[in-house]
């Protein structure tokens, strides 16, 4: 029973979000860490994400059954009823939002609610099924966790929070398009109008390169604006440049498109994990660091 209730919350997604939440939280803390606030933020947002994923599984049952990757989900196989999954999601959401309301800030709660509404109400119920722009809308909800972590400390949506929101939104696009390419047949069978299916893999490849290039520039705004230091800048330059080179390899002749997309996807996770860790530990402004070298 525990396995069913855990699997419906998509633990892999929760773990990925935990890293970005912690990164945003520690970036805003700048070394002055409130451990209880951090625990409440991490647990609260994890439960909110788990809630959204559980309800998404209920909504997506009809398309999950058409996809090889998702047809073994417990809401599809009948191991868990739709009502049980829905109630599970609602309870997790109530507890998660309760923790955020009780222990964090109004700004953090607002963005958690914003991300939840976008993911469940806009993306899952409509955009994913009906529009090629569903990925873009979904990217907004995927970018919320680090902003929640940041705002839990700062209490406001400032330039640092805005950079995180744009940065993580841009990252979501090539990450998601890569999945859609190597899972092309799944999305096609389910009738989901992701860019590779709706407008072709060649256009998706161009978008992947474009988004990574813009993302690499936006990431630099953190050190340029004084939120992170030289170490973060080095990690960002190396990992983002390598990711861009990897994306450009998609234009080689006779390339295995599916294998290439898997590589782009895998490195996207390495990139965002490395940057989340880097911004958590290198929160000193780059200007004083450069002056210290003189």
UniProtKB/Swiss-Prot annotation:
Transmembrane segments: 8-28, 35-55, 82-102, 107-127, 132-152, 162-182, 208-228, 229-249, 263-283
Subcellular locations according to the entry: Cell inner membrane
Annotated GO biological process: heme O biosynthetic process
GO MF term list: protoheme IX farnesyltransferase activity
EC number(s) reported in the record: 2.5.1.141
Mode of membrane association: Multi-pass membrane protein
Reaction equation(s) it catalyzes: heme b + (2E,6E)-farnesyl diphosphate + H2O = Fe(II)-heme o + diphosphate
Pathway(s): Porphyrin-containing compound metabolism; heme O biosynthesis; heme O from protoheme: step 1/1
A GO cellular-component term linked to this record: plasma membrane
Pfam families to which the protein is assigned, alphabetical: UbiA
Coiled-coil residues: none
Keyword annotations of the record: Cell inner membrane, Cell membrane, Heme biosynthesis, Membrane, Transferase, Transmembrane, Transmembrane helix
Principal localisation: membrane
Top-level enzyme category: transferase
Note: Carbon 2 of the heme B porphyrin ring is defined according to the Fischer nomenclature.
Functional summary from the UniProt entry: Converts heme B (protoheme IX) to heme O by substitution of the vinyl group on carbon 2 of heme B porphyrin ring with a hydroxyethyl farnesyl side group.
Family: Belongs to the UbiA prenyltransferase family. Protoheme IX farnesyltransferase subfamily.
HAMAP family referenced in this protein's UniProt entry, alphabetically: CyoE_CtaB
Record-given protein name: Protoheme IX farnesyltransferase 1
Species per Swiss-Prot/TrEMBL record: Pseudoalteromonas translucida (strain TAC 125)
Underlying gene: cyoE1
């Amino acid at each position: 029973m525990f396995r069913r209730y855990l699997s419906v919350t998509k633990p892999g997604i929760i773990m990925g979000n935990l890293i970005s939440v912690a990164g945003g939280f520690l970036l805003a803390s700048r070394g002055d860490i409130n451990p209880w606030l951090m625990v409440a933020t991490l647990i609260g947002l994890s439960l909110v994400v788990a809630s959204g994923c559980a309800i998404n599984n209920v909504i997506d049952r009809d398309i999950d059954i058409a996809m090889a990757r998702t047809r073994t989900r417990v809401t599809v196989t009948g191991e868990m009823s739709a009502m049980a999954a829905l109630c599970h999601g609602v309870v997790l959401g109530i507890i998660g939002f309760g923790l955020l309301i009780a222990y964090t800030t109004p700004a953090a709660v607002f963005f958690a609610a914003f991300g939840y509404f976008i993911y469940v109400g806009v993306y899952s119920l409509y955009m994913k099924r009906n529009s090629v722009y569903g990925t873009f809308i979904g990217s907004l909800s995927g970018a919320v966790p680090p902003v929640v972590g940041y705002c839990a400390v700062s209490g406001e949506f400032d330039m640092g929070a805005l950079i995180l929101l744009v940065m993580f939104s841009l990252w979501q696009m090539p990450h998601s398009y890569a999945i859609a390419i190597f899972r092309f047949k799944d999305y096609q069978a389910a009738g989901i109008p992701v860019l590779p299916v709706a407008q072709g893999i060649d256009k998706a490849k161009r978008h992947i390169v474009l988004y990574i290039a813009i993302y690499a520039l936006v990431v630099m705004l953190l050190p340029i604006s004084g939120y992170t230091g030289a170490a973060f800048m080095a990690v960002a330059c190396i990992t983002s440049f390598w990711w861009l080179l990897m994306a450009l390899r998609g234009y080689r002749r006779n390339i295995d498109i599916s294998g290439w997309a898997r590589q782009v996807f895998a490195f996207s996770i390495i990139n965002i994990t490395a940057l989340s860790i880097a911004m958590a530990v290198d929160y000193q402004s780059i200007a004083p660091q450069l002056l210290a070298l003189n």
